Amino acid sequence: FIGTALGIASAIPAIVKLFK
């Protein structure tokens, strides 16, 4: 559960990069 949340948190910067 915690590992999944950590994975999502790590993916956030990549998603933000797509919008920039």
UniProtKB/Swiss-Prot annotation:
Expressed by the venom gland. Has activity against Gram-positive bacteria. Has insecticidal and hemolytic activities. May act by disrupting the integrity of the bacterial cell membrane. This is M-poneritoxin-Ng1f. It comes from Neoponera goeldii. The lineage of its organism: Eukaryota, Metazoa, Ecdysozoa, Arthropoda, Hexapoda. It is found in: Secreted; Target cell membrane. Its main location: secreted. GO terms for molecular function: toxin activity. Keywords: Amidation, Antibiotic, Antimicrobial, Cytolysis, Hemolysis, Membrane, Secreted, Target cell membrane, Target membrane, Toxin. It comes from the Eukaryota. One of its GO terms (biological process) is defense response to bacterium. Coiled coil: none annotated. GO terms for cellular component: extracellular region; membrane; other organism cell membrane. The modification Lysine amide is found at residue 20. Belongs to the non-disulfide-bridged peptide (NDBP) superfamily. Medium-length antimicrobial peptide (group 3) family. Ponericin-W subfamily.
